[in-house]
């Protein structure tokens, strides 16, 4: 005995519902994995940026004044950006990834509904086959045939009722799925817009801090660091003394102690007396 048109329609309906559930399970699962990976990579980017902030601060401590100030302010802005990125990660996790994960349990419930429907359909098909077999074996036994017809009628009514319930359930499922799709992607775009809006503000400030670095001033500081003030003052004193010595240089007079000067004078007088005696002897 072939299926009735109503049974064939219910089978086609169940098959279509099953394909729809399979489709949602496949693509929502893929979306969930991809969004989760997106969040993980964003979190890793936040961690790398934290390392960058730390290194910029460390390097800034070794630099000249305006470079140091510019880098410190830049690092502060970059750290602020990571706070916004952390908020982005948390919002994506709670508003996008988690709702997608919840579809795992939703799909499981729909499969159970489909299983109940298929069981009812199989029971109907079994009763229909039983009735056909009874008619062939006992065509004159109206009691057995009537009982088989009653069982088939009951199975058909159950299958019809369960199919109606499944149709209503899947209709609600599709309605909720469409709302969730709209909400999930709206949340994703909104979260990204908020983050990138804040990022533009923060990065603009960071850019300005770098532009505020005074290269000429810091270059002068660096040059002065090559000639410290103490070294320069000593160098100036040496140069000044050198110039003074060259202009005041003249004949040198060797000073003698008083004792030496008296001794020399006595020796000179003795020499003069000897000269006088010699000259007198020559005259005689």
UniProtKB/Swiss-Prot annotation:
Domain of life of the native organism: Eukaryota
Transmembrane segments: none
Chain intervals for the UniProt region annotation (Disordered): 242-284
Pfam families: FAM92 (PF06730)
InterPro entries: AH/BAR_dom_sf, BAR_CBAR1/2, CBAR/FAM92
Family: Belongs to the CIBAR family.
Protein name per its UniProtKB record: CBY1-interacting BAR domain-containing protein 1-A
Name of the encoding gene: cibar1-a
């Amino acid at each position: 005995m072939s299926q009735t048109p109503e049974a064939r329609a219910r089978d086609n309906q169940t098959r279509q519902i099953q394909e729809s559930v399979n489709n949602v399970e496949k693509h929502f699962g893929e979306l969930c994995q991809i969004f989760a990976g997106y969040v993980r990579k964003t979190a890793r980017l936040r961690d790398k940026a934290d390392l960058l902030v730390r290194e910029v601060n460390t390097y800034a401590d070794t630099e000249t004044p305006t470079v140091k100030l510019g880098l410190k302010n830049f690092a502060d802005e970059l750290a602020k950006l990571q706070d916004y990125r952390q908020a982005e990660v948390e919002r994506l996790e709670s508003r996008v990834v988690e709702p997608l994960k919840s579809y795992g349990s939703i799909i499981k419930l729909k499969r159970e509904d489909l299983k109940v429907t298929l069981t009812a359909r199989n029971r109907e098909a079994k009763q229909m086959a039983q009735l056909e077999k009874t008619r062939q074996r006992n065509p004159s036994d109206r009691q057995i045939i009537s009982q088989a017809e009653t069982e088939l009628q009951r199975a058909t009514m159950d299958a019809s009722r369960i199919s109606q319930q499944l149709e209503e359930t899947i209709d609600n499922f599709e309605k909720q799925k469409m709302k969730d799709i709209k909400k999930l992607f709206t949340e994703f775009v909104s979260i990204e817009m908020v983050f990138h809006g804040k990022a533009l503000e923060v990065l603009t400030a960071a850019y300005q801090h770098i532009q505020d670095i005074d290269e000429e001033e810091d270059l002068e500081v660096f040059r002065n660091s090559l000639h410290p003030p103490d070294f320069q003052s000593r160098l100036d004193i040496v140069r000044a003394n050198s110039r003074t010595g060259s202009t005041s240089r003249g004949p040198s007079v060797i000073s003698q102690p008083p004792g030496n000067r008296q001794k020399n004078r006595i020796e000179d007088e003795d020499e003069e007396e000897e000269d006088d005696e010699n000259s007198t002897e020559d005259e005689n």
